[in-house]
């Protein structure tokens, strides 16, 4: 029986999730086993640090081709609310209704990943997202009563395991009118590019279209990209890095 993974990126305007079907376990066992110390650049030019070495790049390409997206969604939980700047009760009710509507899918998932919200550090804390994430986590705890265990999944796993550079430079942004401007690259932009790269290599035009349509509707493209990369990072940790 195939395994399914669901990954959530939490937000009141963008409550996104992706469900992936995991490749057969034999697929992971047949891949070259590259020791962890030999996977990423640790020395050399600044822009290469953290990116995968050639041998592991080949493994990553094969790894990310093994899984398959079976569902990608992005819901606006503020529908029907009167004040979008606070967490009205209606937002939580909307979240529960969304989760209930996909209950048969959650029943088939072997892993439930919820992106962990940062509660420390110098960056601004998104307290609304933290509260929503906790309610989402509690929903699955209550629903499955120990038969399934939701995981608070740190964001750094997807960037570290999939080879995001430790230092970002600039990118040339091209506008519709043909004008260009140099912008600072970052992890969010990298994640969106990486997700599109994976889907392009898979030939998954349906999921790419879903992501693009959300972007055109001003829903954040990177939320669904993050969900996809969480599924891929979890697959590396759980199925590739387990003892062969």
Residue spans of the language-model regions?
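Phosphate- and other anionic-substrate recognition elements at nucleic-acid/protein interfaces
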Residues: 1-244
């Amino acid at each position: 029986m195939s395994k399914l993974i669901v990954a959530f990126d939490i937000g009141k305007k963008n409550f996104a999730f992706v469900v992936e079907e995991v490749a057969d376990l034999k697929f992971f066992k047949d891949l070259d086993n590259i020791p962890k110390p030999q996977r990423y650049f640790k020395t050399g030019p600044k822009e290469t640090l953290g990116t995968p070495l050639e041998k592991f790049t080949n493994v990553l390409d094969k790894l990310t081709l093994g899984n398959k997206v079976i569902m990608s969604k992005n819901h606006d939980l503020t529908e029907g609310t009167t004040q979008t700047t606070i967490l009205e009760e209606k937002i939580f009710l909307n979240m529960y209704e969304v989760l209930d509507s996909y209950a048969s899918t959650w029943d088939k998932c072997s892993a439930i990943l919820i992106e962990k919200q940062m509660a420390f550090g110098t960056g601004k804390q998104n307290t609304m997202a933290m509260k929503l994430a906790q309610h989402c986590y509690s929903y699955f705890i209550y629903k499955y009563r120990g038969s399934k265990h939701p995981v608070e999944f740190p964001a750094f796993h997807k960037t570290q395991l999939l080879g995001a550079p430790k230092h970002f430079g600039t990118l040339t942004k091209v506008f519709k009118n043909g004008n260009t401007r140099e912008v600072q690259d970052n992890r969010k932009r990298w994640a969106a590019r990486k997700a599109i790269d994976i889907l392009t290599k898979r030939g998954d035009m349906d999921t790419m279209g879903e992501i693009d349509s959300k972007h055109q509707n001003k829903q954040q493209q990177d939320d669904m990209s993050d969900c996809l990369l969480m599924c891929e990072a979890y697959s590396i940790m759980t199925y590739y890095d387990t003892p062969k």
